[in-house]
Amino acid sequence: MTFNPGKKLYISDVTLRDGSHAIRHQYSIANVQAIARALDQAKVDSIEVAHGDGLQGSSFNYGFGAHTDLEWIEAVAEVVTHARIATLLLPGIGTVHHLKEAYEAGARIVRVATHCTEADVSRQHIAYARELGMDTVGFLMMSHMTTPQNLAVEAKKMESYGATCIYVVDSGGALSMQDVRERFRAVKDLLEPSTQTGIHAHHNLSLGVANSIVAVEEGCDRIDASLAGMGAGAGNAPLEVFVAAAERLGWNHGTDLYTLMDAADEIVRPLQDRPVRVDRETLALGYAGVYSSFLRHAEVAAEKYGLSTVDILVELGRRRMVGGQEDMIVDVALDLLER
């Protein structure tokens, strides 16, 4: 397709959802309002708000949040005037009832997330979101785990259920730039021209920004990113870095770079109890193709059982574990202990 460098990119911030993983879902109300105010002032298009694992993610399996999803959403709704509030729903964790509550609290966009080969389970939630009048997005996680052609078939299912935008989601931060290019070409070949596409990158191989740029070159409309890369694993594509790169490329991003830079360093980075960066453990996620939010859980298991976090993560990758199988991390640790 012909690349249009002048089109307005849709900047989708995920600091208050994916970023929640980086601090074990412990954002205070004051934290979320300070971050949301800065993002709103910088004129991002949307701000995603939820537990890291989406609506109703607060649980023994994923980690309990400092507040409920609704408390966080309502807090953000009080302070934003420009950005629209988005939320994330994983069918089986959140239900249509939780989605309605999120809508009533102020969310107007929902990203319905499934494993990249399980779009079928999103039908009810996508259809219901459309009934509510929400901007409805299909979110295909762990997109490195299937072929571009299969990914396109799953994307087409989500489109048929009513999603008007489909995301290629690199949950493991394992995609190369060529991988991204091939997936966008396959997906866009099957989808209607009116259906938008989005990229959600992770930075585990330091390719978060590069992969987002490649996606835009392939006609991607929406770009997920977070302040200071705040997110699972080595984090997401850092928002201020992507915007600076887009500015250098002459792309129309519509946001204020300096406001984003200040918010990243002054508000977000000080909250990190573990640096969000590429290091031995987060690099193992990208190398082994492991769901990025497994990081903190694997670190806890490694400390408890006297193991190497890297060994646990690489074994999880070998077993092709996917999002939602956090309970298997301890099983893997116990198996490694017996070797």
From Swiss-Prot:
Site (Transition state stabilizer): R17
Catalytic residue positions: H21
Enzyme class: lyase
Alphabetized Pfam families for the sequence: DmpG_comm, HMGL-like
Keywords tagged on the record: Aromatic hydrocarbons catabolism, Lyase, Manganese, Metal-binding
Any one GO MF annotation of this record: manganese ion binding
Name the record gives this protein: 4-hydroxy-2-oxovalerate aldolase 2
Organism: Azotobacter vinelandii (strain DJ / ATCC BAA-1303)
Species classification: Bacteria, Pseudomonadati, Pseudomonadota, Gammaproteobacteria, Pseudomonadales
